[in-house]
Amino acid sequence: MKLKTKTMEWTGNSLRLLDQRKLPFIEEYVECKTHEEVAHAIKEMIVRGAPAIGVTAAFGYVLGFREYRSGDLKEWMKQVKEVLSRTRPTAVNLFWALNRMEKVFLENLKNENLGEILEEEAMKMAQEDIETNRAIGRNGAELIEDGSTILTHCNAGALATVDYGTALGVIRAAVEAGKRVRVFADETRPYLQGARLTAWELMKDGIEVYVITDNMAGWLMKRGMIDAVVVGADRIALNGDTANKIGTYSLAVLAKRNNVPFYVAAPISTIDPTIKSGDEIPIEERRAEEVTHCGGNRIAPEGVKVLNPAFDVTENSLITAIITEKGVIKPPFEENIKKILGV
């Protein structure tokens, strides 16, 4: 079984990941042959984006199973899952994917074809992600008017998923439907996913895109230059509170103040029904060097103290709607999320 998209390639024996740290200047793949190499790729942001992380971890689980040599298989796979789980604490898709793989593993523990069954499940997950993103795109495109200028933050495109994207999937689907769309991509400090990745993706697709600094958004909204904000999500609480790349909350506040619709585009798997509100979402703190350095060059004084939370939480009152593959969820969010989840 094989899979090949922009973000990842499953060769049948290894997982090749597009090294997103080097984009847009170098297109280079990193080959992972063990679950620990996959964990390293997730932790070091060779691959990033909640849906992509989830599927990557699923293939890491497959590789972990193949590494088993002797002893208690269940205990070995528990350790494999733990190694992969420790990589990124905020993205719920990671845990969703690993729990799904573990369930299949335990249900087929005595099956002699267990390795093939696990590989099939990871492949199924990858294909589902592509189909899900296209459904999100179709549902979201209906909210985009012809001639709109859309502001997006970070990168929630094909690079953040198996293919097509969530927030950028909405934009792609609108363009495919014949609508004229212009995009403003926040540079998204400190990792510059907007400037490096979103701009790269949209330019390859021939979609008009402007890179703006993170602190321009409010002024552009005030001048009436932005018609909607569309972002992705790393975890959504049961009440609709949404964790996404740091800076998302600021955009939501600005959008509310300037009467600009603020949309979150994410698969149902990003909703965490075990978390009642955003107050319970763990926020990853990353290395100081990501803030003090840019492009390998120091840009801040030696020894300066740094805060580097990778995500923030936008409360549901600032969100116009959540776009999913099962439809568009509008307020009251908790009631409507429960309906769509069937809980």
From Swiss-Prot:
<feature type="active site" description="Proton donor">
    <location>
        <position position="234"/>
    </location>
</feature>
<protein>
    <recommendedName>
        <fullName>Methylthioribose-1-phosphate isomerase</fullName>
        <ecNumber>5.3.1.23</ecNumber>
    </recommendedName>
</protein>
<feature type="binding site">
    <location>
        <begin position="244"/>
        <end position="245"/>
    </location>
    <ligand>
        <name>substrate</name>
    </ligand>
</feature>
<dbReference type="InterPro" id="IPR037171">
    <property type="entry name" value="NagB/RpiA_transferase-like"/>
</dbReference>
<dbReference type="InterPro" id="IPR011559">
    <property type="entry name" value="Initiation_fac_2B_a/b/d"/>
</dbReference>
<keyword id="KW-0028">Amino-acid biosynthesis</keyword>
<dbReference type="InterPro" id="IPR042529">
    <property type="entry name" value="IF_2B-like_C"/>
</dbReference>
<dbReference type="Pfam" id="PF01008">
    <property type="entry name" value="IF-2B"/>
</dbReference>
<feature type="binding site">
    <location>
        <position position="88"/>
    </location>
    <ligand>
        <name>substrate</name>
    </ligand>
</feature>
<dbReference type="InterPro" id="IPR027363">
    <property type="entry name" value="M1Pi_N"/>
</dbReference>
<feature type="site" description="Transition state stabilizer">
    <location>
        <position position="154"/>
    </location>
</feature>
<comment type="function">
    <text>Catalyzes the interconversion of methylthioribose-1-phosphate (MTR-1-P) into methylthioribulose-1-phosphate (MTRu-1-P).</text>
</comment>
<dbReference type="GO" id="GO:0019509">
    <property type="term" value="P:L-methionine salvage from methylthioadenosine"/>
</dbReference>
<keyword id="KW-0486">Methionine biosynthesis</keyword>
<feature type="binding site">
    <location>
        <position position="193"/>
    </location>
    <ligand>
        <name>substrate</name>
    </ligand>
</feature>
<feature type="binding site">
    <location>
        <begin position="48"/>
        <end position="50"/>
    </location>
    <ligand>
        <name>substrate</name>
    </ligand>
</feature>
<keyword id="KW-0413">Isomerase</keyword>
<comment type="similarity">
    <text>Belongs to the eIF-2B alpha/beta/delta subunits family. MtnA subfamily.</text>
</comment>
<comment type="pathway">
    <text>Amino-acid biosynthesis; L-methionine biosynthesis via salvage pathway; L-methionine from S-methyl-5-thio-alpha-D-ribose 1-phosphate: step 1/6.</text>
</comment>
<dbReference type="GO" id="GO:0046523">
    <property type="term" value="F:S-methyl-5-thioribose-1-phosphate isomerase activity"/>
</dbReference>
<dbReference type="InterPro" id="IPR005251">
    <property type="entry name" value="IF-M1Pi"/>
</dbReference>
<dbReference type="InterPro" id="IPR000649">
    <property type="entry name" value="IF-2B-related"/>
</dbReference>
